[in-house]
Design a protein with these regions (language model features):
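Active-site-proximal alpha-helix that buttresses catalytic centers in soluble enzyme cores
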Residues: 1-246
Length: 246
C-alpha cells in the first residue's frame, strides 16, 4: 500500500514503452515458454502457467492441474536466483492454495537454477547475439533486494557471517540460498563461458527503493564507467527469464 501510489503513474508510462501488439511481453513470452516446455516434456506431463499479479492466476493454474487429477505437482518459480521475497513467497502462495484441497498430491519444488547448465547455456546463446568485442565493459544487472533480507537469510544458518562482500565469492552450504551469492555465481559462470576477462565486468543490482539495498547499484556503476571513458557498455539481465518492465 506504500509503493503503489508513488509508482503507478511512472510505471504506466514505462509499460506503454514495452507493450507489444500481442500484449504484455511478460505474459506473451511466459506463455511461449509454457508451450515449448509442454512440447519438450510430451503428453506425460501437464504444464500450466500461473502468475502472482496478473492472469492466468496461480489459483487458476493449480485448479486445472486438480481437474487433471495429477499425481505430482512440480512447482517451478521462474526466478533463477533464490530469494525469500520472490521464490519463497511464490511457493508459499501455491501451498496456501494446495492446503485447501481435499487430497493433496506429492509436491516437488525447484527452488533455484542459477547455475543449471541449461540456464547458463540459454544466457550464453542470448549473449552471442552481440559482438562482445565491440564493447568496453559488461554489466550483469540483477534485481536488487534490501540488505536486511540478505542478513536474515544468513541468520537462518545460525552463523551470521554475511558481510555483503567476499562471503559471496564461493557457493557453500551456508550461502547456497543467499540471493546475492547466487547472482555472483551466475556472473562467474557466464564470464567464464563468454571469455570476459577480469576487470572488464561487474555484478550490479537495480530497482532499489532506498540506500539500504544491496550494492553496487547498476545505474551508479554505468554512470561511473561513462565518467571513466567507457562509451559502449553491454548490460545483461540474468535474473529475468522473460522480458518485463525490469
Amino acid at each position: 500500500g506504500i509503493i503503489v501510489p508513488f509508482r503507478a503513474s511512472n510505471s504506466a508510462k514505462l509499460y506503454k514503452q514495452i507493450w507489444t501488439a500481442e500484449g504484455s511481453p511478460l505474459l506473451v513470452n511466459s506463455t511461449k515458454m509454457k508451450i515449448a516446455l509442454q512440447k519438450e516434456l510430451g503428453d506425460e506431463y501437464v504444464v500450466e502457467l500461473g502468475m502472482r499479479y496478473q492472469s492466468p492466476s496461480l489459483e487458476t493454474a493449480l485448479d486445472k492441474l486438480k481437474k487433471e487429477q495429477v499425481s505430482e505437482i512440480i512447482i517451478l518459480p521462474l526466478y533463477p536466483q533464490y530469494a525469500s521475497s520472490s521464490t519463497g513467497s511464490s511457493v508459499e502462495a501455491a501451498m496456501k492454495i494446495l492446503e485447501k484441497w481435499e487430497v493433496t498430491p506429492s509436491v516437488k519444488i525447484i527452488s533455484k537454477f542459477y547455475d543449471h547448465p541449461g540456464y547458463i547455456d540459454a544466457c550464453v546463446a542470448r549473449a552471442k547475439n552481440y559482438n562482445l568485442q565491440d564493447y568496453d565493459y559488461y554489466v550483469f544487472s540483477y534485481h536488487g533486494l534490501p540488505e536486511r533480507h540478505i542478513m536474515k537469510g544468513s541468520a537462518h544458518y545460525g552463523a551470521n557471517t554475511c558481510k555483503l562482500g567476499s562471503c559471496c565469492d564461493v557457493i557453500t552450504s551456508s550461502n547456497e540460498y543467499c540471493y546475492r551469492a547466487n547472482c555472483f555465481e551466475t556472473t562467474r559462470q557466464l564470464v567464464k563461458r563468454l571469455n570476459i576477462p577480469e576487470g572488464k565486468y561487474e555484478t550490479t543490482f537495480q530497482s532499489r527503493l532506498n540506500d539500504k539495498w544491496i550494492k553496487p547499484y547498476s545505474d551508479k556503476v554505468i554512470e561511473r564507467k561513462a565518467q571513466e571513458g567507457k562509451r559502449k557498455v553491454l548490460v545483461f539481465s540474468p535474473a529475468f527469464v522473460a522480458d518485463c518492465l525490469e
